[in-house]
Every structure is written in C-alpha cells, then in structure tokens.
Regions:
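Jelly-roll (double-stranded beta-helix
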Residues: 1-232
C-alpha cells in the first residue's frame, strides 16, 4: 500500500442536518497530505436527516458520482432533470460548462446515507449531462462507471472506472493495479491481507503496486474499487 486512510482520521463537517466525512480535503477541511489520488478528488460519506438537504448550488468541469446506500435522494438540476435516486442506484452528473442542482432527503421516514465522489474530467467545457441507473451485482466485482459505458455502466469523461466489490465471509479476491492507480473505499464489513485490516470508511491507495490480495472477514465485505490513471 502506498496510501492508507483510516476512517477515524477523515475530515468532518457537521451542520446538525448533515454529518459528512471527507476522505480528501473538501470545503473548510484542508489537509495538504490528503488532496486526492490520481484524478479522484473527493469521496464524501454523507448522512442527511429527514427533511433536509443541499439547496441549489453550482459546479463546473467535474464528474460527480453519487452512490446511495440508505434512503433516497431527490435530485433537481438546471438541465431540467428531477429524479429520485433510491438506495442501490448510482448517479453521474457531468458538470462541464456549468450546472446547478439541489439534493434533498426524499424519505419522510428514514435518514439518507450516500457516497459522493468527484473525478476530474479529461475534457473541459463539455455540455453538462446526467445519468442514473441500478446495476445488479454480477460476481465479486461489478462495474458501475466506465469511460466507454460498457456492460450498462454509467459513462465517465475520464480514463477511469468504478467497481462495486462484494465478498461473502471468507471469500478472497486479487485486485489489479498494474500500470494504473487503484483506490479501495470500504463501505461495510471487514477484510484483510497480510499487512492491513480494513473496515467501513477506511481507504487504501495503490500507486506503485502490481496486485493486492484481500480476504473478507466473518461479516463479509463491501467496497468501491477505483481504477484510475497511473500517478506519474
């Protein structure tokens, strides 16, 4: 491992209605040691209470990916989109030349929990666009977001992919970061290899490694795996 980010060392923003943990520097949280990895700029782990959310705000030249873990997001944007994104679905918004949007907890009975990731695009000034989908798990590693939209994945303006990793108790996998940069963000459960144990919210970055073996604990393991351009 070239980069280890324990969950309890992440930055935090708490406004009462929002409890957000920042893997990398974001907003008022700044740490020069945690500015992102490769083209992955943001991983925010957000919890939003009932009836609350983010009012209309703007972005430009950023690929914004949202994966809902609990509850549902009500999304509305300046492109005319108004959708509900329930748990298990993933959303991609390319901000391009500029877009405004709002995100609120749609549920009246349960809190909202989601991950939001920002990836720097390889082309600036594109037309803003939006996609969302649900992709069923097909084996331990299932692709969610890619540069070419293969296998029903959302299409990203960058040479990068995001996979959902799900391992049953005791199941093992080898993650491949040869000639690339890999980043693993743990969602739930536990896993380990010979040198490190990880649990929910922990992150591991591989910038000079070829492969990484991982075995799930007794409670299984779920994570997102980012396949990113190599760090020069």
């Amino acid at each position: 491992m070239d980069y280890i980010r324990p969950a309890n060392t992440r930055g935090q923003t708490n406004f009462g209605w929002l409890d957000s943990r920042h893997t990398f520097s974001f907003g008022d949280y700044y740490d020069p040691l945690h500015m992102g990895i490769s083209v992955l700029r943001v991983i925010n782990d957000d919890h939003v209470v009932l009836g609350a959310g983010f009012p209309t705000h703007g972005h430009r030249d950023m690929e914004i990916i949202t994966y809902v873990l609990q509850g549902a997001i009500e999304h509305q944007d300046s492109m005319g989109n108004r959708y509900v994104v329930p748990a298990g679905e993933i959303q991609r918004m390319s901000a391009g030349t500029g877009v405004t949007h709002s995100e609120y907890n749609f549920s009246k009975t349960e809190p909202l929990h989601f991950l939001q990731m920002w990836i720097q695009p390889n082309v600036r000034g594109i037309q803003p666009s939006y996609e969302q989908t649900r992709i069923e798990q097909a084996g331990p590693l299932t692709v969610l977001v890619t540069a070419d939209g293969r296998d029903g994945s959302l299409k990203l303006q960058q040479d990068a992919s995001i996979y959902r990793l799900q391992l049953q108790a005791g199941e093992e996998i080898q993650l491949d970061a040869r000639q690339r940069t890999g980043y693993l963000h743990a969602i739930s459960g536990s896993a380990k290899n010979d040198s490190v144990s990880i649990g929910a919210g922990d992150g591991l970055g591989l910038t000079h490694s070829k492969t990484f073996n991982l075995g799930a604990g007794d409670d299984g393991f779920a994570a997102l795996w980012f396949d990113l351009p190599a760090v020069v």
